[in-house]
């Protein structure tokens, strides 16, 4: 069976012994659009220190999609999204 290509640019860079470059961005749609066109391997949406808003996260992930890039590169996203989420447990009081 042929080996499937990595869909995650961060893992692909690390496996090749390269540096994976990511940035932190606020979870807003304008940030998502800007990050989707950037040269970073990944983007970390900072949602840890804000009230949890799954709708805002959904919008950010949707705005990172670019139909032209999908048609050109297939399923491999140019920038992989990561999300810092708020804690949910005993550690909230620390």
What is each residue range found by the language model?
Residues 1-94:
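Expand to "…catalyze enediolate/carbanion chemistry for C-C bond making/breaking, isomerization
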